[in-house]
Amino acid sequence: MLKSLYWRLNFFFKNRKSKRLKKRLGNNSSTLTVNTKNGTFVIDPADLEVSRKLAVKGEYGTEEIIQISKFIDNKSTVLIVGAHIGSLAIPIAKLCSELVAIEANPNNFKLLETNIKLNNISNILAHNIAASEKEEIIQFQLNTVNSGGSKRVPINNHYMYTYDNPEVIEINAYSLDDYLPKSNFDLVLIDIEGSEYFAMRGMTQILTKTNTLIVEFLPHHITNVAGVELTDFLNNIPKHLTKLTIPSKATTYPIDVGVTILEQMFESGHGDDGIIFHN
């Protein structure tokens, strides 16, 4: 009970802080431009996660970018599902040949397009759609305090997903096998706040041809957003990938051992921003 109260208070104060920042800037300053290690970015100051880290720390996801760079080169093709405003996509695009970016949130997508142009990136092809198991229209909530946390309306819509009273809209979702037919990607990164399960079900052909798959792994997303079991989630991982790296543990495992570790993490509620399946 005390833990639940702590998180409710934490979310409450985050929401209040976000609103105060927005109010302080006034109606004529809905965005800010910041120069960072990742590039130059137009950000939403109300976003206290990725945007705030870019503004305050001058960087975001540095370790993740370094990790990804080990699996690609200047001839590689990359697919990022959940590109947000481009804080990872833009620096990664400088390391590869071609990058396809999928972003469902229309507000984030506008910033993504702006940031691609601002950084003179010519090898990113961006799409404002959601990834799912089939072509459909889904209910999608636009979070503001953590705009990267925007997601399809969860099956179990816990307070942690709604504390900032997100607007709910309808957006178009597609199977990426159908939307990006005959596409080959050396590396696929999926970070879409619990919809990874649905996205992977709709991109089996893409996944069978990739060399590296990076997927956000948060037990509460798998349970509450997708409403599935861990085994359902893992059944989507392509069988040809034989190793699993868990960055938060700084360890690479054979796939069978790694799956056992993931089961333990799932039971204890521990996640990782991007577990890596590879060879």
Show where each model-derived region lies.
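S-adenosyl-L-methionine
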Residues: 1-115, 119, 161-169, 179-181, ...
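Short, glycine/acidic-enriched loop or turn micro-motifs at the edges of active sites
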Residues: 47, 83-85, 106, 131-133, ...
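Short internal loop-to-helix segment that lines adenine-nucleotide cofactor pockets
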Residues: 56-79, 121, 125, 137-139, ...
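Core-facing hydrophobic residues within beta-strands of well-ordered domains
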Residues: 96, 185, 207-210, 241
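Active-site flanking residues adjacent to catalytic metal/cofactor-binding acidic residues
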Residues: 102, 190, 215-216
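Core alpha/beta nucleotide-donor-binding catalytic domains of modification enzymes
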Residues: 113-114, 118-149
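Conserved beta-strand signature within the Rossmann-like core of class I S-adenosyl-L-methionine
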Residues: 210-218
